[in-house]
Amino acid sequence: MGETKYIFVTGGVASSLGKGIISSSIGKLLQARGYNVTIQKFDPYINIDPGTLNPYEHGECYVTVDGHEADLDLGHYERFLGIQTTKANNITTGRIYKSVIDKERRGDYLGKTIQVIPHITDEIKRNVKLLGNKYKFDFVITEIGGTVGDIESLPYLESIRQLKWELGKNALCVHLTYVPYLAAAGELKTKPTQHSVKELQSVGIQPDVLVLRAEHPLSDGLRKKVAQFCNVDDKAVVQSIDAETIYEVPLLMQAQGLDSTILEKMGLPVGETPGLGPWRKFLERRHAAETKEPINIALVGKYDLQDAYKSIREALSQAGTYNDRKVEVHFVNSEKLTDENVAEALKGMAGVMIGPGFGQRGIDGKFVAIKYTRTHDIPTFGICLGMQCIAIEFARNVLGYADADSREMDEKTPHNVIDIMEEQKAITNMGGTMRLGAYECVLQKGSKAYLAYGEEHIQERHRHRYEFNNDYKAQYEAAGMKCVGINPESDLVEIVEIPALKWFIGTQFHPEYSSTVLNPHPLFVAFVKAAIENEKN
């Protein structure tokens, strides 16, 4: 195509309007037209990455294949576009400032006074263009976190202003705002959007496209009013009303010609509108699945915020669609789970997920849930800490080591069936120091994991410091828990399963990060299938 085109997505009026979904939808529509697209997220917080952030603060921490702890929006990008993102796809203010300070310490600025303009803004611009320069993408979509008007966003907005001036038609700004509905007046109000656009204009940015988030449809008159007072073309005002599922948003945007408008404004041929056949088939199958009785699956964990397990929820949802059933996820707070109430808490559950996490809080409830599902032969899927809890519960109640534990929870345990990894022992810093990113795993032929994947060699993403202690491996296998997935370099146990049960698997890695709309993860598909079969019985 020639020069890379840059699309900036900003937000106004309120946070959590769905900039990530709009960015992903634009990317999907352009990708369907044959363009090579990637999406990056700029977060205005001063943390280097979200790796040490509490999930209640920021939702789940997503992990890229190259081992970067990233914003959960990267999960949306990957699920929608079916691409793999990297460290370069998620930048924070902390990383920008650290890079500038490191350069200053090296003497790269030759004694100049370091300022927000031009040094910070130049570093932001360099990172915006990095993906386009390095990988030759046709489009780089850049989502700016936060809301226009926030102090933290100002350097990013100034950088966008400069890039729009420098790049001309190769840069475009999409501004997402909120149009509230006042029930008392019975009407939608556009004034907040007008003020948000004026705020953007005050820093020198004229948005090219407006996406209006609303609970009710906008009339043509209302859209024309917004276009007139915000200085954009009529057809460049697009509504984004609430949809049944986020996966319908690309089709809603396409129906209003959003992708055509973007191409036209960037001087590119519009051509025929792509059919998005596989995407539409997925949605048709999803709608058909929703007409049936849902399959109930419990998610046992300590974070009751839905975004804390975002990728797991999406992976379960996708797996349900490909099993032609809607998955109803029931969160079960592990802090409140006891031997006395576990039967009631898991009543009616066709399958149980043991969620990932860190630390002692809520872990005893996970042991209770695992013991119950193991002894009642309920399909169970444990991820990361969930897999470690499966191993600990088995050691306590099957191997007979009542005081078995993880070194993370009890440094003095005499039976450390989960131990800290050797290379982690000398590490003191928390941020970015775990075993992160994609690693190889070899599956045991004939195992349920192997049957799910249909291949022997796989690669999955990790985020952990502790591992299964191979000193106990022979005892586990003799008692009925098999180690069926092994890293060929370190001999680290990646997958355990109990073959005698219907479906009882724990993975040290995070399979949810690799599940996409058009390619659901095989372990999740197999787990949901097992839950459906269990429900029949």
UniProtKB/Swiss-Prot annotation:
GO terms for cellular component: cytosol. It is an enzyme of class 6 (ligase). One of its GO terms (molecular function) is metal ion binding. L-glutamine binds at Y56, G357, L385, G386, M387, Q388, E408, R465. PROSITE patterns: GATASE_TYPE_1. CTP binds at S15, D150, I151, E152, K189, T190, K191, P192, T193, Q194, K225. Pathway: Pyrimidine metabolism; CTP biosynthesis via de novo pathway; CTP from UDP: step 2/2. Keywords: ATP-binding, Glutamine amidotransferase, Ligase, Magnesium, Metal-binding, Nucleotide-binding, Pyrimidine biosynthesis. InterPro entries: Class_I_gatase-like, CTP_synthase, CTP_synthase_N, GATASE, GATase1_CTP_Synthase, P-loop_NTPase. Its EC number is 6.3.4.2. It comes from the Bacteria. Mg(2+) binds at D73, E143. CTPSs have evolved a hybrid strategy for distinguishing between UTP and CTP. The overlapping regions of the product feedback inhibitory and substrate sites recognize a common feature in both compounds, the triphosphate moiety. To differentiate isosteric substrate and product pyrimidine rings, an additional pocket far from the expected kinase/ligase catalytic site, specifically recognizes the cytosine and ribose portions of the product inhibitor. This is CTP synthase. It comes from Bacteroides thetaiotaomicron (strain ATCC 29148 / DSM 2079 / JCM 5827 / CCUG 10774 / NCTC 10582 / VPI-5482 / E50). The gene is pyrG.
